[in-house]
Amino acid sequence: MARSKGVTIRDVAQRAGVSVAAVSMALNGTGTLSAATRLRVRAIAEEMDYEADALARGLRRSSVGAIGLVMRSLDALGEYAPRGVDVFTRYIGAASAQAMDRGLSVMLVPDPTKRPTPPLALSLDGYIVTMPHVDDPVVGLLERRGIPYVTLGRDPSRPNFTDWATEDEGSSFRRIYEHFAASGARSIVLLRGTDPNAWNIDSEATYRAWCESVGITPRVYMSAERAGEHGGENIAHAIVDDGIPDAILCHTGRQAAGVLAGLTVRGVAVPDRTMLAAASDSEHTRHSRPAISAVELNAAETTLALLDLLQARIAGEPSAGPVLTTARFRVRASSRRTDTNA
């Protein structure tokens, strides 16, 4: 993927219908331009993603030996160190160590579409964007800039984009449902998140297809990722009010811990009455009582695939993606029944 040369000050001046000097004055807060003209020029420069910084313009013309990592799920959460959620640090650690083995540095970048954008952020050799959203503005920015990128998880808005890798989530979800069924479950609830990414969208599609294949009526509940344990506990009460199921699969460990707390308050025994599992392992699932069955994501293998895809994309080579890796489902006490007829 060839990088674009970027927007120049002359491009901004032409779009705004003013001189190059006027653009410079508007962006630097100098000169005698009217307030209206200054605001209009700045708005046009921002719309065109113009980089006024000379360092950024210079770096963009050559390799800097560094790539960016954008954690879209953390951007959406509004916090970058959620308590007890270690899956993101595992991906960050794996990507950083493996990149260094290849002579690359990794820069963690919060949503680069939010102003002001650090100049270096748009001068990196490429990007890994995790869990892109529908019509993701970060992907849009990278596309406009001609910056090579790959994604952790498919881009739901770009079905023809193949430079992505992830765990085989469809297989993982089906394995959990089959585990529930083998332990006697005849009614299974899915609690998913609300972020508009492929993980949420595809997991619900997988769940509904599996339910149809075995003749189970689907029951889907949603709780915003940022609601965490509190959101899971609230949903647990709604689930019980609607009819206690044999099993519940939650997307996140925080949701699962909250659901466990809510079920306990309502007197629903886990796993004897209702089995429980999470699609993403965390401190919450490991330290709950009972410990909650969960999918341990394969950060090491997945980030290796992402780096392979990104380096090939930077070099302009054909896509070898998508790549699916294998996660591990850890069965714990929350879904382990001694009597499968319970």
Named regions from a protein language model:
Residues 1-66, 339-342:
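N-terminal helix-turn-helix DNA-binding module of bacterial transcription factors
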Residues 19, 65, 125, 186-187, ...:
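Short acidic/polar active-site loop segments enriched in Thr and Asp
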Residues 114-123, 232-243:
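Short, well-structured alpha-helical segments in soluble
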Residues 76-78, 82-87, 110-115, 165-175, ...:
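Hinge/beta->alpha junction and helix N-cap segments in small-molecule ligand-binding domains
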Residues 133-174, 254, 280-292:
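Flexible loop/hinge segments that line or gate small-molecule binding clefts
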Residues 39, 50-116:
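Amphipathic helical "hinge" segments at domain boundaries
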Residues 219, 241-342:
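Flexible loop/turn connectors
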